[in-house]
Amino acid sequence: MKADNRNRTSVAIVGAGPNGAALANLLGLYGVDTVVVERAPQIVDFPRAVGIDDEALRLFQTAGVADELSRDIIQNVPLRMFNARGECFADVRPSVREFGWWRRNIFMQHLAERTLRDALARYPHVSLRTGEEVVGLEQDDAHVTLRVQGADGQHYALDADYVVAADGGRSPLREMLGIPLAGTTHPMKWVVVDVKNAGLDQPCTALNCDPRRPNVCIYLPFNYRRWEFLVFPHEDEQAIAQPESIRALIAPYVEDVERLEIVRARTYTHHSRVAERFVAGRIALVGDAAHLSPPWIGQGLNAGLRDVGNLAWKLAGIVHGRLNPGVLATYESERRAHAKAMIDLADTFGAMLMPTSRPVAFLRDRLLAAARFAPGLKDYVLQMRFKPMPSYTRGVVVTGASDASGAIGRMIVQPDVETADGVRRKLDDVLGPWFSIIGWQCDPQASLSDDERAFWTALGAKFVQIVRSRSGTCREQRIASAHGSECVEDVDNAMADWFDRHAGPLVVVRPDRYVAAQTDAVGIAGVTAAFRAFAPQQQAEAAHVC
């Protein structure tokens, strides 16, 4: 940046890890003046997150960085669970791509951070300041002032309309705000090791559920591999991270342990904690600053990216005067409960998969072996249907009698569609990065009054009509909108299936791809009226008199 004013910005993000950098990319896309303050002068090289799911990649698709990130990602990696005898008792390999991406993918955090930071160069209104530390803050009803120690050691004040704490599990900003991080710190520690040249042809994430020493082995990009070993209470956490100890731990799993190169090793403690508040005045917490999870279902970083996806458009809408400031509070009401649910699931999985008790491990093996003969239960596990999906009943949603289908407050699917010029595209690329209104086999503008159309246009919504594949009279004459909506074809019948399950041909889709409302031509007036509550008063009134 680019930004000429060093001391003033619309949004300040503290922390340039994957959550902070992802948020900065989205705010850059939305045209929001943004400053990112990062204490570390360089991207840190510790072993960190390696799992990224379909929801996260969908967010990066919106941000315009999914393709570049994918160059460093192994997609569609199965999860296999092995007992103490080395027998695989569960093979989790989801085959569905309902959101347009595979559910299980493996990456390395430091590579993703570099890509995300490099992508910020696209935006002259976004500034990344590394080697700078926030040492104090003050806020009032109008703005937040951060006291920042610059890379040169000098202090300066940074005024922002809003601040986001993406500064990790030890979050200094959360501490400054006095927000408790409630929950549990687990007594057991784990040594995490990244190696090269392991010579192991095991292209999966392996949970070695051996009660003698539970461990995880993860297939990483570019000939890397990660092991995570339980450290018992009587063991010294520094000694076990030494090269000779690491090789002794890995030796049972490789042919030539001397051949592998130990790249990095660190001992970690697992936490299951959630901040009591995600929003304090004009400051929001995201990622590890808001919640800490054990790694057993690979959702720690992904939960943080859900925070980012939920928060980015709300901040952008508020800053640009399209949404009222009260919408910020819905970030907490929508995200906190789901973040807690994911942590609870991770705790359950950890207790089931990594017991150190042999009788408990024996019982687990028998139960999971039996589950293979129950088709419904088997599919529930192998397709990862156990992962709780966010479902918003309050916040920026319009529920009520129209929600008989259960779609409102849930993420909409993302199939491929075909544009008027015959190009196959992912649905989100057609919807655009902001609000959209989909009409299934109807023009979404046809049932809007001039007043209602003016409101949605002022909000910035895009109108998209989806029709059945090959609905036109011939290849050269496809169905077109009479009102200027973009018209696309449902080439794989995925949207037809979705609308069969969720009645109502008109769907309001939020920028984070959650369904804000679903209705019909009669109900769209009520939905529009309800949505006016989310707009600034002057905008709602102006649209009402157009």
UniProtKB/Swiss-Prot annotation:
Catalytic activity entry: 3-(3-hydroxyphenyl)propanoate + NADH + O2 + H(+) = 3-(2,3-dihydroxyphenyl)propanoate + NAD(+) + H2O; (2E)-3-(3-hydroxyphenyl)prop-2-enoate + NADH + O2 + H(+) = (2E)-3-(2,3-dihydroxyphenyl)prop-2-enoate + NAD(+) + H2O
GO biological processes: 3-(3-hydroxy)phenylpropionate catabolic process; 3-phenylpropionate catabolic process
- List positions binding FAD: 10-39, 278-288
Superkingdom, natural source: Bacteria
Q: In which pathway does it act?
A: Aromatic compound metabolism; 3-phenylpropanoate degradation
What InterPro entries does this protein's entry cite? 3-HPP/3HCI_hydroxylase, FAD-bd, FAD/NAD-bd_sf, PheA/TfdB_FAD_monoxygenase
Q: Which UniProt keywords apply?
A: Aromatic hydrocarbons catabolism, FAD, Flavoprotein, NAD, Oxidoreductase
User: What does the record give as cofactor?
Assistant: FAD
* A single MF term (Gene Ontology): 3-(3-hydroxyphenyl)propionate hydroxylase activity
Q: Which Enzyme Commission numbers does its entry carry?
A: 1.14.13.127
Checking NCBIfam families in the record gives: PRK06183.1-3, PRK06183.1-5
Q: What does this protein do?
A: Catalyzes the insertion of one atom of molecular oxygen into position 2 of the phenyl ring of 3-(3-hydroxyphenyl)propionate (3-HPP) and hydroxycinnamic acid (3HCI).
Q: Which family does it belong to?
A: Belongs to the PheA/TfdB FAD monooxygenase family.
Protein name stated in the entry: 3-(3-hydroxy-phenyl)propionate/3-hydroxycinnamic acid hydroxylase 2
Organism of origin is: Burkholderia vietnamiensis (strain G4 / LMG 22486)
Report the gene name. Answer: mhpA2
